[in-house]
């Protein structure tokens, strides 16, 4: 049924789906391998096939937690627990932090950090994105303290030096360590490993949302293998964190380097042929760059956790937990789904015994 529905969607809504594709989710890789063989033979290449344990790129989980742990991890209460856990990593120091800037001593105060944190949180952006605002706001306050101390020490400086002073602070080891301790960027995996390995952090994040027994069930070694239930939590954490801006900056730098390399290559090619009036070096470089990304739509979508699909087909859907449904709904905000399964046959303690129970948290806006 799932295979036929995917083929039907691709054929009937080809125009709408050619740039977004279809995601097929099934519990076993064996069934998905069959789909991967059949659909290309029908000329369909815009399909991504994933098990629930593969929803987050870079993570592949194929084992389940025990029933009690799976029930806790699959509960929507985890959204509140994880949100509290992320906010707890935006810390105000208990006391002032002394900083040495080329022999000039200044202080980062709890008040400075609290004000910078408030500015960052007010943006409403995910943790890693809001960190940019936090760092800027904290540095603005440190520059003022730095200037005041330079003035007190009667060291020469001018207003036009402020950008250089800001650079000195931004690159200073003490400053970087202090700001990282207050608001460190994380990947979903590094955050989850440290969070679930810490009883103290679990207790703080739990609040009134999960019980003491459930906290004990969630606690795990830092090097534990990912489970299928973890994948939905990693997806939620990724939403709360956002991309690491430092990693994004590295990608931008890499892209600029590649662009320069393409341009240099194009200029060399054009210098060897008579191309006047035909194509510019920049145009040729753009063509080279376009050719280098020869991935199919399915390959691009599978590598992008934030990809929005035109349609999602879910096989054995009764096995999915509320948190896994939340992860899937995120990948199709229009809620264009084909759901294949039987609630009476669920074998998962966190699965659905009725479709109303499984889907009502996500379909309130569609109620008639």
Segments (PLM) and residue ranges:
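Walker A/P-loop NTP-binding motif
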Residues: 3-15
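Conserved P-loop NTPase-based nucleic-acid remodeling module centered on helicase motor cores
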Residues: 43-110, 117-118, 137-138
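Non-catalytic alpha-helical coupling and interface elements of nucleotide-dependent molecular machines
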Residues: 11-14, 40, 44-47, 83, ...
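Conserved helicase motor core of SF1/SF2 NTP-dependent helicases
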Residues: 15, 20, 29-73, 241-242, ...
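Conserved helicase NTPase catalytic core signature
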Residues: 105-311, 320-324
């Amino acid at each position: 049924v799932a295979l036929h529905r995917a083929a039907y969607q691709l054929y009937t809504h080809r125009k709408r789906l050619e740039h977004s594709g279809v995601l097929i989710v099934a519990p076993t890789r064996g069934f998905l391998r069959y789909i991967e063989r059949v659909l290309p033979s029908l000329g369909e290449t815009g399909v991504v096939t994933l098990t629930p344990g593969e929803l987050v790129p870079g993570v592949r989980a194929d084992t389940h937690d025990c029933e009690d742990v799976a029930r806790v991890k699959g509960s929507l209460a985890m959204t509140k627990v994880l949100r509290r856990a992320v906010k707890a990593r935006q810390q105000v120091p208990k006391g002032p932090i002394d900083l040495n800037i080329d022999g000039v001593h200044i202080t980062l105060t709890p008040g400075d950090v609290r004000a910078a944190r408030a500015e960052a949180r007010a943006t409403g952006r995910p943790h890693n994105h809001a960190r940019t605002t936090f760092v800027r706001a904290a540095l603005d306050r440190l520059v003022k303290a730095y200037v005041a101390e330079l003035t007190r020490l009667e060291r020469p400086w001018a207003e036009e030096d402020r950008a250089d002073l800001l650079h000195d602070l931004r690159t200073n080891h003490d400053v970087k360590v202090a700001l990282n301790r207050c608001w460190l960027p994380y990947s979903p995996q590094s955050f989850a490993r440290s969070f679930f390995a810490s009883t103290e952090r679990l207790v703080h994040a739990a609040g009134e949302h999960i019980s003491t027994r459930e906290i004990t069930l969630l606690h795990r070694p830092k090097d534990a293998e990912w489970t299928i239930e973890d994948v939905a939590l990693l997806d939620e954490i990724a939403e709360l964190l956002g991309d690491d801006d430092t990693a994004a900056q590295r990608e931008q730098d890499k892209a600029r380097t590649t662009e320069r390399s393409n341009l240099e290559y194009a200029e060399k090619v054009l210098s060897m042929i008579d191309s006047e009036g035909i194509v510019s070096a920049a145009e040729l470089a753009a063509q080279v760059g376009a050719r280098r990304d020869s991935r199919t739509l399915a390959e691009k979508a599978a590598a992008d956790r934030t990809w929005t699909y035109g349609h999602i087909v879910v096989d054995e859907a009764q096995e999915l937990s509320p948190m896994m449904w939340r992860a899937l709904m995120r990948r199709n905000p229009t809620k264009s789904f084909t759901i294949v399964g039987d609630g009476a046959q669920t074998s998962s303690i966190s699965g659905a015994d009725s479709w109303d129970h499984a889907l009502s948290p996500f379909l309130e806006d569609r109620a008639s």
